[in-house]
Every structure is written in C-alpha cells, then in structure tokens.
Amino acid sequence: MTTQLLAQHGWGGDQRSWAPWRPLAEQRGWRLSCAERGYGQLPPQQPGWDPHASRRVVIGHSLGPHLLPAELWQQATTAVFLASFAAFVPPGREGRPVAAALRAMAARLAAGDASGLLRDFHTQVAAPFPPERLPPGPLEQGISEAGAQRLGADLALLCLL
C-alpha cells in the first residue's frame, strides 16, 4: 500500500515548514509533496496525487486546507487539519473584532508593508514564545510583489470563511 502526503502551509508561511516531516515520512516509505503559495521567493506550486498512491493524505495548516483545489480534495482518502478551521470570522457581533483586524491587515498590505505585517503576525501567533521558534518562512527570503498580492487575496479569503 503506497501512501502520499500532500501538505499545504497556512497564510504567511511556505513549504519549508514541512521540512522536519520529510525524513519521518521517508522512514515509513511515504511520499511527501508540499504545495507552495509563493508569498516569498519560492515559486507557487500545486502538486497532484501520485496515481499509484492508495492512501492520499492531505495535511493542512491553518488556512492551508482552504487553499487546495476541489479536485485534489475529491481524490483524498484522509485529511489532517493542524490548527485549522471551518469558519474564521464568527457571525454577527462576535465576528466584528476579527473582521476589523483582517481589514487592518489588508490596509497594511495595500500600503506596501507586507514584511512588517508578517513580522507582527508571527509575533502574535508564536506568543508566548519568540517568533524565532517558528519554522522558516517567506520573511527570511523577502516578500515578492506577486507574493504580497497573493497574501492579500488569501487574506480576503479569510473574510469569506
């Protein structure tokens, strides 16, 4: 039985966050494929399923599962969600602070502050630990112009969830 893992990072990350998983997968004879949004200097890529894989496992972090195409999901046999969600902005009054924070983040992106926004975001999500404890991401290599646009588009997707 052949197993393929297909991993998708979340908002503001990149595929390098899955590097520690690779040797563990290989030890088990599993193939690990990593999707990449291309926020930084790594080009976007969307791997597909190996036609010989009998087990097709999606591993998605945070927004990651929402970034994968429907046809990929239709062929998956298992899903693993890491700190993910079905909905991001709660309905009604409870969702107002979250929606306001997302609008403020979008304004920073529109003003050209993608790197500063990601630094602040990483500080928040890493807390109470320092952001240096997070896996490497696009900040280390620099945010590309196209990457900043993708960050904005994916941030807008969060508003719809």
Model regions and ranges:
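Conserved HGGG/HGGXW glycine-rich cap/lid loop of the alpha/beta-hydrolase fold
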Residues: M1-G48
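Glycine-rich His-Gly loop
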Residues: A7-W11, H61-S62, S84
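Active-site signature of alpha/beta-hydrolase-fold catalytic machinery across serine-
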Residues: P20, A70-E71
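Aromatic pocket-lining residues of Rossmann-like dinucleotide-binding sites
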Residues: A25, E71-L72
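Gly/Ala-rich beta-loop-alpha elbow adjacent to hydrolase catalytic centers
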Residues: I59-L68
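A conserved short beta-strand
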Residues: Q75-F88
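Helix-rich cap/lid subdomain of alpha/beta-hydrolase
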Residues: F88-E140
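Hydrophobic, aromatic-rich cap/lid helix
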Residues: P136-L161
